[in-house]
C-alpha cells in the first residue's frame, strides 16, 4: 500500500494536476465564468462556445449546446478539449450542464487525461449575491478518479471554493480540495483583470498562487501569471 500511495503521489506531481485535482479554474472558469473547474455560469450565456489562447502556450475550446429549457432554466450538452503548450492533448471532457438565470448551476462531466486516466466529476454552484457591481458565488465538486495505472485503485477527490467579480472587470477566487487515498490537500488563490471585452471577445490578465501537501511532498505557494484571449461564438 505504501508503494501505491507513493506512486500515485509522484504521478500527481508529474501530471498536470490542474486537470486532475483542483479545477483552478484555469481554463474553464475563464471561458464560462467554472469549476473543476466546471462551466457553471454566473449568468445564462447565449454563446455556444469559445476558443481560448493563453500566454503560456496552452489553448483550448469548449462547446455548450442547449438541449432544452426556457428563459429561467437551461439544460445543455457540453464538450471541451485542452491543448498543452506543445499542442498535445491535455484533457478532453464531455458532459451535461444545468444553468439557472439566478446564477445557480450544476454539471456532470467525464474527462480523459492522457498519462493519467479518466475522472467523473459532479459540480455545483450557488450564487449568493448579485447586483450591477458585485457577484459572489460558492461552488463545490466531487470527483471519482480512475487512473490507468496497474494495481492502483480508483479514488475520490472533493473540493469547494468561492468566486467574486466586481463589475465584470476584476475577479478573485479561492479553492481547496482533498484526496483521501493519498492524503493530499490542494489550495489555490486567483485573481483576474479584464483588459478588453466585446460581446464576442475578451482579453484578461490572470494571477494566482497554488500549493499542495501530501505525506511525501509539500510545496510552498507557487505564483503564476498569464494573459488569455477568448473568442466566443
UniProtKB/Swiss-Prot annotation:
Q: Where this protein primarily resides, as one coarse class?
A: secreted
Which InterPro entries is this protein grouped with? Attacin_C, Attacin_N
An example GO CC term for this entry is: extracellular region
> Signal sequence: where?
1-17
**Is Secreted given among the entry's keywords?**
yes
The protein's UniProt keywords, in alphabetical order, are:
Antibiotic, Antimicrobial, Cleavage on pair of basic residues, Immunity, Innate immunity, Repeat, Secreted, Signal
- Positions annotated as propeptide: 18-46
Location of this chain's protein in the cell: Secreted
Q: Name one GO biological process term.
A: defense response to bacterium
State one Pfam family annotation. Attacin_C
Q: Which domain of life is it from?
A: Eukaryota
Family, per entry: Belongs to the attacin/sarcotoxin-2 family.
What is this protein for, i.e. what is its function? Hemolymph antibacterial protein.
Q: Please share what else the UniProt entry notes about this protein.
A: There are six forms of attacin that are divided into two groups: acidic (E and F) and basic (A, B, C, and D).
What is the recorded name of this protein? Attacin-B
- Give the species: Hyalophora cecropia (Cecropia moth)
Amino acid at each position: 500500500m505504501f508503494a501505491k500511495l507513493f506512486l500515485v503521489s509522484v504521478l500527481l506531481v508529474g501530471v498536470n494536476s490542474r486537470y486532475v485535482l483542483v479545477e483552478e479554474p484555469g481554463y474553464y472558469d475563464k471561458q464560462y465564468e467554472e469549476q473543476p473547474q466546471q462551466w457553471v455560469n454566473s449568468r445564462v450565456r447565449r454563446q455556444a462556445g469559445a476558443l481560448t489562447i493563453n500566454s503560456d502556450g496552452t489553448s483550448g475550446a469548449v462547446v455548450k449546446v442547449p438541449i432544452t429549457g426556457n428563459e429561467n432554466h437551461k439544460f445543455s450538452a457540453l464538450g471541451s478539449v485542452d491543448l498543452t503548450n506543445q499542442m498535445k492533448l491535455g484533457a478532453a471532457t464531455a458532459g451535461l450542464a444545468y444553468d439557472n438565470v439566478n446564477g445557480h448551476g450544476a454539471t456532470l462531466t467525464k474527462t480523459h487525461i492522457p498519462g493519467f486516466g479518466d475522472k467523473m466529476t459532479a459540480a455545483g454552484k450557488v450564487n449568493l449575491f448579485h447586483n450591477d457591481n458585485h457577484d459572489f458565488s460558492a461552488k463545490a465538486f466531487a470527483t471519482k478518479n480512475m487512473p490507468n495505472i496497474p494495481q492502483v485503485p480508483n479514488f475520490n477527490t472533493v473540493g469547494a471554493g468561492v468566486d467574486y467579480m466586481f463589475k465584470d472587470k476584476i475577479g478573485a477566487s479561492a479553492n481547496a480540495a482533498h484526496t483521501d487515498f493519498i492524503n493530499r490537500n490542494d489550495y489555490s488563490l486567483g485573481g483576474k483583470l479584464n483588459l478588453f471585452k466585446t460581446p464576442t471577445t475578451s482579453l484578461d490578465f490572470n494571477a494566482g498562487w497554488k500549493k499542495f501537501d501530501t505525506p511525501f511532498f509539500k510545496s510552498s505557494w507557487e505564483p503564476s501569471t498569464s494573459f488569455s484571449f477568448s473568442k466566443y461564438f
